Structures are given as C-alpha cells and as structure tokens.
C-alpha cells in the first residue's frame, strides 16, 4: 500500500471562480441570475447542474485546467453513442435522480445507498486530477467527490474479498447507445479494481466537477475516478459495487483482451495497438497534431503514490 499522505486541507466553499477562469465564472453567474427568473415560471430544465460545497485539498496539479465546456462535451460514454459529442448531445433525457447504489458481495453488512443522501452526508472534496485516455489525449479536471474507501468501509468487507466489481446502468429508453442491432459493447458496462487499488487514497467516487453536480454526459450521478489509470477504468453511472474473491470481468478487456488490460495503468512504455502511449494531446491546448503533444508520465504522474502497489509485477504483461 502506498505511503502517500496528503497535507491537511481547509474547509471552504468551492465557488466557480476557485477553479474556473474569472471571465467564464462571471458570465455563468450572470446567466444563472437570469435563469432564476425562468425557474420561477417552472420553465427551467432539470439538466442545469446544482452547485456543490466541497473542501479544497492538497490533491491538485500545477497545470492549467481543461476548459469546462471541453470536459463536458468531449468524452467517451458509449451508452449515449460512440462519438465524443454524443454524451452531451444525447443525454438530456437521462434521469440521474433518484438513484440507488448497492454495495454487496463478500461483506458483513450489504447496503443500499441513496445517492442524494450520500452527497448530503459524505465530506465532499475537490480533487484536481489529470485524466489520461487510452486514445492518447488528456485533460485536467477539478472533480468533486469522496474517497471510495470511505464508502467501502461501511459494509465491513470479509477477509476473502480481493477485488471490487463495478456495474453500470442499463436504460435503453434513456441511453440511445444501448439500442439498435449493433452494440459497441455488451451492457451493462462493468469494471474492476484490486482491493488495495480501490482503497487507495487517490481513488474516489465523483459526484461533481467544476463546483457543480455531475452532468449526465460525465457519468451522473456517481462515477469512479482512478487518476493513474486510463479513462476507460472510470465507470460512469454506477449502480452496484461488489466485493469479490476473483478478478472480475471488465467491459473493454472482454471486448478486446489484446488491447485493453485489466490493470490499465498509464504507461508510456507500453503502446496500445492503435495508439502510441509515449505522448498525449491535452484537450483545449493547441491543434490536433504536431508540437503541442506532451510526454506521457508513468502512472499519469502519480507514480510516487501508487508504484509500490505493483512492486515486482511485469507492467508490460500486466497492462
């Protein structure tokens, strides 16, 4: 287990100007004031995110944040379609609340959590993390959430539990990517972690970003964030978390085991068959090709905190 110890954090309200460029924050505030008049008439859309309060923490990187519009409109969420713009374009009908999250398996006290109650009760934190996609692009995102370990400890896991299995949602009526004759993946989306990975301080369940609740397009109402792994490990719209004894199946590994490993640790020395992992393109900075690419860091820059989890492992074989 890593010896990573974050410095003490202070309690503060995470306002938009704390993480958003000032001009954008001011425009948003003016817009929200105007929206208040619309809301009074009942015409406001439920798609507008609610503000969240969170603690500022030492979990941050000295890098420019990816613009909020890019984070919310350029991502992979195949339940809504395979194009990068599909999640934002096709998720308007998705209903993230009410939402139940079951935590079960090899535990003494299986529980079903109401996500709205979790958001109200858990000590939410802002975590500014790098996010690296296996497609060789990256972002820097100010997530809001809480350590996964703080939820898992509530169900009293048994000693026989070695892995954590995650299950996503199946709602073809609300998720057009789950309909049709030819499906990109088998549903539900499933993922997994070793127990020590799940309990690591860097691993969080996110319920928001940029000071607001998660947009549907980014995995509302609750998703996994593991910053040293490729983005496909970050399962969205989670419905179940189970303690299991054996390594659980994962969606992309099941789809193409030669391309997507179970561990999926960011590793510039191990290429994907279709994408070199040596460099990456930071979304929101420069053009698509050329000199704006930057070197990819082992474990996405979190090696000091997590490399000890894989001591003695062949990271090329266990990709």
Swiss-Prot record:
Signal peptide range in chain numbering: 1-54
GO cellular component terms, A-Z: periplasmic space
SUPFAM superfamilies hit by this protein: Oxidoreductase molybdopterin-binding domain
PROSITE patterns: TAT (PS51318)
EC number(s) on file: 1.8.5.-
Location of this chain's protein in the cell: Periplasm
Pfam families in UniProt: Oxidored_molyb
Membrane-spanning segments: none
UniProt keyword annotation of Signal present: yes
Cited InterPro entries: MsrP, OxRdtase_Mopterin-bd_dom, OxRdtase_Mopterin-bd_sf, TAT_signal
GO molecular function list: metal ion binding; molybdopterin cofactor binding; oxidoreductase activity, acting on a sulfur group of donors, quinone or similar compound as acceptor
Residues the entry annotates as binding Mo-molybdopterin: 75, 78-79, 133, 218, 223, 234-236
Domain of life: Bacteria
Main subcellular location of this protein, as a coarse class: periplasm
GO terms, biological process: protein repair
Modified how: Predicted to be exported by the Tat system. The position of the signal peptide cleavage has not been experimentally proven.
Keyword annotations: Metal-binding, Molybdenum, Oxidoreductase, Periplasm, Signal
Catalytic activity: L-methionyl-[protein] + a quinone + H2O = L-methionyl-(S)-S-oxide-[protein] + a quinol; L-methionyl-[protein] + a quinone + H2O = L-methionyl-(R)-S-oxide-[protein] + a quinol
Free-text cofactor note: Binds 1 Mo-molybdopterin (Mo-MPT) cofactor per subunit.
Homology family: Belongs to the MsrP family.
Subunit structure: Heterodimer of a catalytic subunit (MsrP) and a heme-binding subunit (MsrQ).
HAMAP family, alphabetized: MsrP
Free-text function comment from the UniProt entry: Part of the MsrPQ system that repairs oxidized periplasmic proteins containing methionine sulfoxide residues (Met-O), using respiratory chain electrons. Thus protects these proteins from oxidative-stress damage caused by reactive species of oxygen and chlorine generated by the host defense mechanisms. MsrPQ is essential for the maintenance of envelope integrity under bleach stress, rescuing a wide series of structurally unrelated periplasmic proteins from methionine oxidation.
Record protein name field: Protein-methionine-sulfoxide reductase catalytic subunit MsrP
Organism of origin: Brucella melitensis biotype 1 (strain ATCC 23456 / CCUG 17765 / NCTC 10094 / 16M)
Gene expressing this chain: msrP
């Amino acid at each position: 287990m890593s010896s990573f110890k974050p410095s003490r954090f202070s309690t503060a309200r995470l306002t938009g100007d704390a993480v958003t460029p000032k001009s954008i924050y001011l425009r948003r505030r003016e817009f929200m004031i105007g929206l208040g008049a619309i809301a009074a008439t009942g015409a406001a859309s439920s798609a507008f995110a609610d503000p969240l309060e969170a603690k500022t923490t030492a979990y941050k990187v000295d890098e420019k944040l990816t613009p909020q519009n890019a984070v919310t409109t350029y991502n992979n969420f195949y339940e809504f379609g395979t194009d990068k713009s599909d999640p934002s374009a096709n998720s308007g009908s998705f209903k993230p609340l009410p939402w139940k999250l079951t935590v079960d398996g090899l535990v003494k006290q299986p529980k079903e959590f109401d996500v709205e109650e979790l958001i109200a009760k858990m000590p939410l934190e802002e975590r500014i993390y790098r996010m690296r996609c296996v497609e060789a692009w990256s972002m820097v995102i100010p997530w809001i959430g809480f350590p996964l370990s703080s939820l898992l400890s509530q169900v009293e896991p048994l000693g026989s539990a070695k892995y954590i299995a995650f299950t996503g949602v199946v709602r073809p009526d609300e998720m057009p990517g789950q309909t049709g004759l030819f499906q990109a993946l088998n549903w539900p989306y499933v993922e997994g972690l070793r127990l020590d990975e799940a309990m690591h301080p860097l691993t969080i369940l996110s319920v928001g970003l940029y000071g607001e609740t998660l947009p549907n397009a980014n995995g509302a109402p609750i998703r996994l964030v593991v910053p040293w792994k490729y983005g496909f490990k970050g399962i969205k719209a989670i419905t179940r978390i189970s303690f299991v004894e054996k390594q659980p199946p994962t969606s992309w590994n099941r789809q193409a085991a030669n391309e997507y490993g179970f561990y999926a640790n960011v590793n510039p020395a191990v290429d994907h068959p279709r994408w070199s992992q040596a460099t990456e393109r930071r979304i929101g900075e420069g053009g698509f090709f050329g000199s704006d690419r930057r070197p990819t860091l082992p474990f996405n820059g979190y090696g000091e905190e997590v490399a000890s989890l894989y001591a003695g492992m062949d990271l090329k074989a266990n990709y």
